[in-house]
Amino acid sequence: MIPEDPLVEILLRLPVKSLARFLCVSKRCYSIIRSRHFINLYQSRASTRESRVMFAFRDTNTFFRWNFFSLSQPPSSVTNIDSTSYCMPVCVNGLICVEHMFRLWICNPVTKKITLFPDCGPRKQFTTWYMGYDPINYQYKVLYLSREHLIAPYIVEVFTFGDEGSWRMIEADENFHSPETRGVCTHGVLYYGAYTGDGAKIVRFDVRTEKFGKFIEMPAEACSIHGVYLGLYTLLDYQGKLGLLATQATSTYDLWVLEDAEKHEWSKVSIFITREMCPYDLIWPGVVGFVAGSGELIVTARDELGQFHILYVDLKKNRSREVWFEEITPSFGSALVLAFTDYVESIVLM
């Protein structure tokens, strides 16, 4: 019999699909893989592995279905998830969270396992939610905000996935705000744009302590150029930092990167996609993210024939490379596209 320590080390090196098969090999393997200690070790090592990009497409022909594709070798379809909500799906540290039929669901795209979150009480008219990950305690949490009418303050609740408990209400009276943008979770902090009594701000929420920090001021230059309407900005992860992207003109973008949240310090990166970078005459190119590690720009667009393209643009080397999914049809050209740039396999929900 293999001693436990070497066996654990062997199991830690396996991909999630192989671990799922090992659950049926023996009671010993099952006990190890299901243990909290092993799950924490696996999640910790997963964060050090090279991340991949997960794309989500909502086809115009299947408006209520999201199609997820992983940029592996070769690129492949991961899973399809129905969603009747206008809220966008979220992918954090390997798990996908969606809203369907007014309920929240969480899915592991590798194992195809889906589970339903507990109901958080009577449904209110205005709701929004975000998912974050605590890399210290290896916990997934959902932040849920709801209110009865537009002028009422939001009720804020948190649920820790994997716990047998219920939704917990947290204090947020001193941080009254109205969420507006998609969220970005990096290094255990969840960020999103919101309107407050003092205008547009960036909200930060510590996933581990479940506490809101002081609002972050929008970069002054961004407000003077693009205005304070948050719908003009896209929040994204830029090399592990919060990025605020705005379109200057066709193929021209301004990116502000949060350098110090306490001092409200931002740096600016100007982006211009030249004809030399793209081998096609692209129509309505759009930036959807940055590749973790390489910093390549992810651009989606259609050509004059309506064919859909995904390009990785290297701004330093002034060149691009195309990503191709055989499953994507021309109808995706007018679809909504999301990119989750730090996707890693998760052992949770296996």
From Swiss-Prot:
Any matching Pfam family: F-box
InterPro entries associated with the record: F-box-assoc_dom_typ3, F-box-assoc_interact_dom, F-box-like_dom_sf, F-box_dom
Cross-referenced CDD domains: F-box_AtFBW1-like (cd22157)
Domain F-box: 1-45
Protein name as it appears in the record: Putative F-box protein At1g19160
Organism of this sequence: Arabidopsis thaliana
